[in-house]
């Protein structure tokens, strides 16, 4: 199985399976001299780890990260950084009944068709457990961004679960860390809690939409045509488990706007040009404008549910499948820190690409 690596200069390779002894990431291309501590990476992993509330899987994993290489005296050396996270709470017996049947909505049947075999224990590489490695790599990227672009900030939050979207008029960034949904609207967070409780009792699950916003992004990241920043961001978010759609800025809603409404007008401010709106999501022509970079992605409902679903076995028999084990009623909740990590990795990668191509030179206006 190839294609376990992403990035151009800042390159991340993830490895390991959901029920294997460990998983992790090999990070190559981090500039030397960046302050990197396991405790700082652990902070980001703790936001993603399972079992923290009744709305996520009850699998109890500490997700304790170990840095095996690539640092010396707390700083990156420029060599590959190896990050490892041990699995400690696997229950492979929960998956014995699906060893020869395919779970509807899962990658099981696609993996079987392509490779002729699959790791049925939690889905192996297709499990969302793989995203812990991405969050660890994102911690390295955040550390490098903090050193290279002080003031750059990345924040993710939920904007919709099922049919229930936040009211943006009540958007309060301070609320994001105060509830289990990373929700900036406290009224909607309370509604989501009741809604998910009902779904759990009905042995069902639901999808969600996550928004990730990066502020303080310098203008000039990305390149025309095949090196677009938004192209790489969309690709990065689409690699996250269960993601089925990605939007940049206004996204699909831009199709409903007129040109006069969608085009972000510009005026001269005290420090140069200023945009009056941000329908473009901080990217024009594939290149960052200095505005907030805004990405949204849609996560499908968790496929592992206790409701019986029709399927087939490896020998062609029709069966009903009930997926036992511990699963998220809404996998979108824990996708928030993953989206943040992917944003960090892509922004750092493009920052390094830009420095290599232009040396940081910029055109001037005024």
Curated annotation (Swiss-Prot):
Matching CDD domains: Chorismate_synthase
Keywords: Amino-acid biosynthesis, Aromatic amino acid biosynthesis, FAD, Flavoprotein, FMN, Lyase, NADP
GO biological process terms, semicolon-separated: amino acid biosynthetic process; aromatic amino acid family biosynthetic process; chorismate biosynthetic process
SUPFAM superfamilies linked to this entry: Chorismate synthase, AroC
InterPro entries (alphabetical): Chorismate_synth (IPR000453), Chorismate_synth_AroC_sf (IPR035904), Chorismate_synthase_CS (IPR020541)
Gene3D superfamilies: Chorismate synthase AroC
Binding site for FMN: 125-127, 241-242, 285, 300-304, 326
MF term (GO), any: FMN binding
Binding annotation for NADP(+): 48, 54
Pathway field: Metabolic intermediate biosynthesis; chorismate biosynthesis; chorismate from D-erythrose 4-phosphate and phosphoenolpyruvate: step 7/7
Cofactor: FMNH2
GO CC entries: cytosol
Cofactor note as given: Reduced FMN (FMNH(2)).
Any Pfam family matching the protein: Chorismate_synt
Catalytic reactions on record: 5-O-(1-carboxyvinyl)-3-phosphoshikimate = chorismate + phosphate
Function: This reaction introduces a second double bond into the aromatic ring system.
Family label: Belongs to the chorismate synthase family.
Alphabetical list of NCBIfam families matching this protein: aroC, PRK05382.1
SUBUNIT field: Homotetramer.
Protein name listed in UniProt: Chorismate synthase
Lineage: Bacteria, Pseudomonadati, Pseudomonadota, Alphaproteobacteria, Rhodobacterales
């Amino acid at each position: 199985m190839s294609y376990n690596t992403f990035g151009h200069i800042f390159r991340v390779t993830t490895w390991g399976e959901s029920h294997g002894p460990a998983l992790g990431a090999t990070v190559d291309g981090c500039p030397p001299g960046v302050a990197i501590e396991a405790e700082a990476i652990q902070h980001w992993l703790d936001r993603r780890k399972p079992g923290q509330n009744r709305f996520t899987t009850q699998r109890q994993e500490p997700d304790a990260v170990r840095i095996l290489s690539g640092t010396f005296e707390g700083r990156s050396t420029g060599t590959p950084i190896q990050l490892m996270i041990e699995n400690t709470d696997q229950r492979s017996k929960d998956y014995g009944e699906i060893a020869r049947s395919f779970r509807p909505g899962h990658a099981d049947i696609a993996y079987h068709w392509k490779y002729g075999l699959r790791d049925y224990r939690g889905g192996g590489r297709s499990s969302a457990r793989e995203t812990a490695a991405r969050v660890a790599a994102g911690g390295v990227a955040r550390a490098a961004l903090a050193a290279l672009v002080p003031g750059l900030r990345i924040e993710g939050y939920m904007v919709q679960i099922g049919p229930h979207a936040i009211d943006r008029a009540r958007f309060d960034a301070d609320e994001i860390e105060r509830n289990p949904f990373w929700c900036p609207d406290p009224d909607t967070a309370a509604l989501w809690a009741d809604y998910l409780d009902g779904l759990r009792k009905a042995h069902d699950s639901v999808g969600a939409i996550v928004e990730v916003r990066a502020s303080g992004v310098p203008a000039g990241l990305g390149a025309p045509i095949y090196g677009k920043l938004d192209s790489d961001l969309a690709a990065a978010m689409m690699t996250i488990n269960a993601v089925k759609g990605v939007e940049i800025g206004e996204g699909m809603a831009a199709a409903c706007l007129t040109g006069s409404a969608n085009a972000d007008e510009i005026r001269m401010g005290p420090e140069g040009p200023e945009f009056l709106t941000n329908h473009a999501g901080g990217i024009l022509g594939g290149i960052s404008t200095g505005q907030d970079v805004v990405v949204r992605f849609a996560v499908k409902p968790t496929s592992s549910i206790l409701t019986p679903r029709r399927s087939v076995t490896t020998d062609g028999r029709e069966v009903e499948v009930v997926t036992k084990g511990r699963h998220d009623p809404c996998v979108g909740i824990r996708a928030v820190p993953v989206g943040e990590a992917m944003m960090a990795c892509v922004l750092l990668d493009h920052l390094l690409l830009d420095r290599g191509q232009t040396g940081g030179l910029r055109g001037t206006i005024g």
